[in-house]
């Protein structure tokens, strides 16, 4: 996501969480509004694999596209590992495939 979330694990979530119920941020709800008739129909909560669960996977795939994702992709892949950028934890996974279009990769 634009803020580095993965699987609805928003900034400042703890890395050890397992699958859990999350309250969606307004940014996440607005990003998904295009899939609904109005913002009122966008769910306020979701089930998410926690980062702890995600990190136990044998292989991971990270996909991003567009210039709007360029900065957060750079932060996640080359910045410090921090709960402020949840996707940054993927730096510690032994088998992550990253697929980016030219725009998303433009700051790397």
Functional labels for PLM-detected ranges:
Residues 2-108:
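Conserved phosphate- and dinucleotide-binding cores of soluble alpha/beta proteins
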């Amino acid at each position: 996501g634009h803020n580095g979330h993965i699987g609805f694990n928003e900034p400042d979530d703890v890395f050890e969480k397992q699958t859990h119920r999350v309250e969606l941020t307004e940014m996440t709800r607005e990003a998904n509004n295009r899939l609904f008739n109005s913002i009122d129909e966008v769910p306020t909560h979701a089930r998410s694999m926690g980062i702890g669960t995600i990190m136990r996977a044998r292989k991971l795939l990270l996909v991003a596209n567009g210039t709007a994702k360029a900065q957060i992709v750079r932060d996640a892949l080359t910045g410090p590992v921090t709960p402020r950028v949840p996707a940054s934890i993927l730096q510690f996974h032994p088998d992550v495939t990253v697929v980016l279009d030219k725009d998303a990769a433009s700051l790397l």
